[in-house]
């Protein structure tokens, strides 16, 4: 269960502040709203309902209940409690959403910051002007509704500045778009490997610009799509999605699609939690919950607010659970983060690795090293060592985030872009590959590489061992990868003729948000692994999976165990730990 700080001492301090503020306000004849006592009264009336997320930030129901205290009739004219008020509220929310896109915009470093020139001056002036005009249109609708006037059901933005839907592209470097079959035909595949298409936009039109993938305990592949990248255009609602793809007949191809969540905006990363997923929704960390078990999100909770949004592809992402139960996530250059937590503000500039504990809502900055951009790829090995991408040349680094002990991967060409990393821990792959690392690269090489990190004293030696496959097509942009429950490697292919962020116009006619592929890589002459039973497994079966050879089996079993209640887990865990043999060489690993 959730464990937040003891509220008794804190409430005593708040009451002292509240009473003093009230006394000073009354002595000066200043109106005072006593939210402390109002909230205490509410909580005592209904102790079974959570009116806050974490003890200080209200839920939607909490705002509804406390609204009369926040806006008392003694200070404000009473609001009508009828259908008119709901109509006004609808229009206000529409206006607020539009204005939010203007004042808390993503990619603000390209609008107000150092990259305003040369990119922002081309991309944003008309877009920003149109957003303000759209806000004004919606503001006028609010006043008309308040006066009792009839308004059209649809907002009319015809009076706002006209912007061509697309513009001709001038910058070079793009590639022609190919069908999945045409793309695969150009792959150069190293002997021994086999690459097949698992899913594409042809079978699943919603599979557009996949950016992050993750397998759940049932063996289903979850995919975050991001066709709104790099920036939603004024008047076009973002509709990024979280998809669930299934291979129900076990033929190596997806044949079923479920939309877990839609109407998202730039879900750069996600990770599983209890009955839902944690999702990046800059400037927020959001939890999307499935409360009725139908594999569709029906509840959204903003857990943390205030993460940077200055560059949309550097926002919080690379979500991965550490062995200690913390959710790690990475943020990059240009960003300024100020998150209010129940333990005080957490601030960071330009780069950070965060660790979030969902039980206590504690957010910690685990590391500010290394500074740099494009940190796409994060993996933790069986001993809890962190391998992540960082620095402008996208060298991989391995250490504990809290330490300064960092090893760099040295390339002949420093302008590489790694994107996604996965330790090889599956008996489906040859013995000589065990412990090595699969890694995507999408610039100066499009495909999957193999790296070797070998311990050397207190740091690591790095070798690039070769390639799995090379696309020979710059529109192939591998952005994430993960070993599936059967040991196959799944690769998310963003697939876009335009490889770049703001270097190309937002409305460049060559941008293509309609495509996306998932590739499945196997070794020809070795059997696949037998998928571990996670869903429906007993506590004892899950605990035994902590001894499994495969990192991913242990990872997924650990998540299932964390979701159990203490009453269910603790007795079985105590018995299991007692049964371990301290003489076993893997004894420390089993305890992790």
Please give the residue ranges for each predicted region.
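Conserved catalytic region of serine esterases and O-acyltransferases that act on ester linkages
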Residues: 27, 50-176
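Sec-exported extracytoplasmic/periplasmic mature domains
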Residues: 22-27, 44, 68-76, 247, ...
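Short inter-helical turns and helix N-cap capping residues of alpha-solenoid HEAT/ARM repeat scaffolds
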Residues: 549-550, 580-584
